[in-house]
């Protein structure tokens, strides 16, 4: 073990010594190479190395007073080739580029509302005037009446009485105010002429739909 360690130590020392000897020489060689390159490139070019500019004519050289032949013809030809500016054409071109005004929409007319028809209330029907039946005084002597019928329907009694009175007959009921469900007699008269009452039985039947009987009148 000791011999191996010693061998390694000796080898390491030899390598370090070689590095110390060889590295300075390498570094000096590189420095010299860089110095040679700097020396090869001159900082300021020599006078003979610069390219001399072409010989320019002197500023004081006199220019020709007359243009060369053919120059005037070329100028005139160029003027003729140039298009002439017509004032009308210029004005037309200017008008072409003027922006067109935006179309203005006409105002929409307001819808006219039709007048609402006035709804007139229908006139109330006028009640027909009932014919005035003259109340004849009951005869003082013997009198007669026509009994048309006896009904329990109070509405039907009132309907028949209205028709007969509208035709001009003298009509009354017993009892005087019809009561629903109770018997009510319909009587026409009284009249002193029995024959007259008998002659009216046909018309009374047409108006009321009832067959009447002539009988003696007894005042209540």
From Swiss-Prot:
Residues 100-109 have a biased composition (Pro residues). Pfam families: SPOR. Disruption phenotype: Deletion causes a mild cell chaining phenotype. Double dedD-drpB deletion mutants grow 1000-fold less well at 42 degrees Celsius and are filamentous when grown on LB, no effect is seen in low osmolarity medium; few septa are observed. Residues 57-70 have a biased composition (Low complexity). One of its GO terms (molecular function) is peptidoglycan binding. Residues 138-217 form the SPOR domain. Its main location: membrane. Keywords: Cell cycle, Cell division, Cell inner membrane, Cell membrane, Membrane, Transmembrane, Transmembrane helix. GO terms for biological process: cytokinetic process. Residues 46-84, 97-137 are annotated as: Disordered. The chain crosses the membrane at residues 9-29. InterPro entries: Cell_div_SPOR-domain, DedD, SPOR-like_dom, SPOR-like_sf. GO terms for cellular component: cell division site; cell septum; plasma membrane. It comes from the Bacteria. Gene3D superfamilies: Sporulation related repeat. Non-essential cell division protein that could be required for efficient cell constriction. NCBIfam families: PRK11633.1 (NF008641). Belongs to the DedD family. The SPOR domain binds septal peptidoglycans and is required to target DedD to the septal ring. This is Cell division protein DedD. It comes from Escherichia coli (strain K12). The gene is dedD.
């Amino acid at each position: 073990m000791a011999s191996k360690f010693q061998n390694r130590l000796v080898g390491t020392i030899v390598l370090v010594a070689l590095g110390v000897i060889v590295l300075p020489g390498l570094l000096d060689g590189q420095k010299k190479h860089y110095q040679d390159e700097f020396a090869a490139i001159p900082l300021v070019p020599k006078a003979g190395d610069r390219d001399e500019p072409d010989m320019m004519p002197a500023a004081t050289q006199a220019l020709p007073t007359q243009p060369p032949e053919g120059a005037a013809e070329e100028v005139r030809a160029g003027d003729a080739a140039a298009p002439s500016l017509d004032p009308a054409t210029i004005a037309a071109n200017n008008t072409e580029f003027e922006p067109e005004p935006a179309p203005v929409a006409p105002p929409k007319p307001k819808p006219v509302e039709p007048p609402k028809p006035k709804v007139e209330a229908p006139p109330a029907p006028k009640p027909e005037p009932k014919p005035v039946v003259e109340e004849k005084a009951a005869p003082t002597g013997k009198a007669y009446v026509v009994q048309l019928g006896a009904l329990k329907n109070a509405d039907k009694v009132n309907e028949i009485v209205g028709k007969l009175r509208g035709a001009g007959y003298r009509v009354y009921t017993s009892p005087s105010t019809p009561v629903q469900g109770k018997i009510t007699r319909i009587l026409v008269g009284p009249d002193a002429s029995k024959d007259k009452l008998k002659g009216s039985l046909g018309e009374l039947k047409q108006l009321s739909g009832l067959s009447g009987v002539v009988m003696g009148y007894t005042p209540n």
